[in-house]
A protein has these predicted regions:
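Short, glycine/acidic-enriched loop or turn micro-motifs at the edges of active sites
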Residues: 42-44, 95, 134, 193
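Walker A/P-loop phosphate-binding motif and the immediately C-terminal alpha-helix
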Residues: 5-42
Length: 205
């Protein structure tokens, strides 16, 4: 499987990365590729556009309900994935209840389970798209980079300073894990105001 079709889309919350990620997954599927779409955000809304606009049960919810957070038991891929439009397999990490636990750890647990189930093995999918919250690039949110599940990193930015601040931190994490073969493929500018001059983003790039 070509790692060129395995993309991690990072960005500040509300920047539009889920829309861009789901469009990427749809584009790959329309090309006849077998696609896995992985939402790595506690809001678990990455797959909304792929499953008729309904929030799917998250990995963390299913995992805790069926097997508990430490025991994979007889967990099957079908237990944690939902078939979306165009045959895209969808999974959402979800997160803990507010004030309890770490959302980044939830992402790591999900990826560990997918790996144990063989979902992330080479040859399983033609394309894998990870939609990852980038406000805080802790070890959990950086798991797709750290564990080498994808090489190509795309950062969604806007003209807002906090979006560029988050992008700068994400770029630093890409550099940290560059020994795994990950690289920054580029920025996607999703402007809040289409009339705004793009000079700030161009200078940042």
């Amino acid at each position: 499987m070509s790692m060129q079709n395995n993309i991690v889309v990072f960005g500040k919350g509300g920047i539009g990365k889920s829309t861009i990620s789901s469009n990427l997954s749809s584009l790959y599927a329309l090309q006849g590729l077998k696609v896995l779409h992985v939402g790595c955000d506690p809001k678990h809304d990455s797959t909304l556009g792929l499953v008729d606009g309904e929030l799917i049960e998250t990995f963390m919810e299913k995992y805790a309900r069926i097997f508990g957070v430490r025991d994979h038991g007889e967990l099957k891929p079908s237990d944690i994935m939902v078939k979306g439009r165009l045959g895209i397999d969808c999974v959402e990490a979800g997160g803990p209840e507010p004030g309890v636990g770490c959302a980044g750890r939830g992402i790591s647990l999900m990826l560990e389970a997918l790996q144990d189930l063989g979902v992330l093995k080479e040859g399983g999918y033609d394309a894998r798209v990870f939609d990852v919250l980038g406000d805080v690039v802790c070890g959990g949110f950086a798991a797709p980079l750290r564990k080498g599940f994808a090489e190509k990193i795309v950062i969604v930015v806007s003209e807002e300073l906090m979006a560029l601040y988050a992008a700068n931190n994400i770029a630093k994490s890409v550099k940290t894990y560059s020994s795994n073969g990950v690289y920054l493929a580029g920025l996607v500018a999703n402007l809040k105001d289409g009339k705004v001059e793009r000079g700030r983003i161009e200078r940042f790039a």
